[in-house]
């Protein structure tokens, strides 16, 4: 991939795939690798994240959220708004809630759909989504 930074390549490698283990240690390594990201790397990740498998999208959301930088908000918001996988959207929502991010009102329908889904499943993440809804701007 032309122009892809070393940090981005490392991050993708650390995320692994469905066949690789994912423990707290792996999450920490992936999250720490984001320290080396350039603005180009963040833009690339935002454009690529939705093409990852469900498993890797979820890992990506966890790592970006764990990193806690405003640079990652665009990636988490893209996963929340557009991932076809509701479990991924739920992780992204929880991470955005942890970061105390105010989301645009336009996301209300997606958040409400996600809240209904999580409530039906008795997921503790439903509270995170409820908080996001209450702070829409």
Language-model region placement:
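Structural detector for internal amphipathic alpha-helices that build alpha-solenoid repeat scaffolds
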Residues: 1-2, 16-36, 47, 55-69, ...
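Amphipathic alpha-helical scaffolding segments comprising HEAT/armadillo-like alpha-solenoid repeats
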Residues: 2-14, 35-50, 69-81, 102-117
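Helix-turn/linker elements and helix-coil junctions of extended alpha-helical scaffolds
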Residues: 53, 83, 119-122
């Amino acid at each position: 991939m032309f122009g892809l930074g070393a940090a981005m390549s490392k991050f993708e490698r650390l995320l692994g795939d469905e066949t690789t283990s994912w423990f707290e240690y792996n999450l920490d390594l992936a999250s720490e690798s984001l320290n080396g990201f350039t603005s180009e790397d963040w833009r690339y990740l935002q454009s690529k994240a939705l093409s990852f498998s469900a498993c890797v999208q979820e890992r990506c959301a966890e790592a970006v959220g764990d990193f806690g930088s405003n640079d990652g908000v665009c990636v988490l918001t893209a996963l929340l708004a557009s991932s076809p996988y509701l479990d991924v959207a739920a992780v992204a929502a929880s991470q955005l809630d942890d970061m105390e991010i105010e989301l645009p009102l336009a996301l209300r329908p997606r958040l409400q759909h996600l809240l209904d889904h999580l409530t039906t499943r008795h997921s503790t993440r439903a509270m995170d989504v409820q908080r996001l809804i209450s702070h829409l701007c």
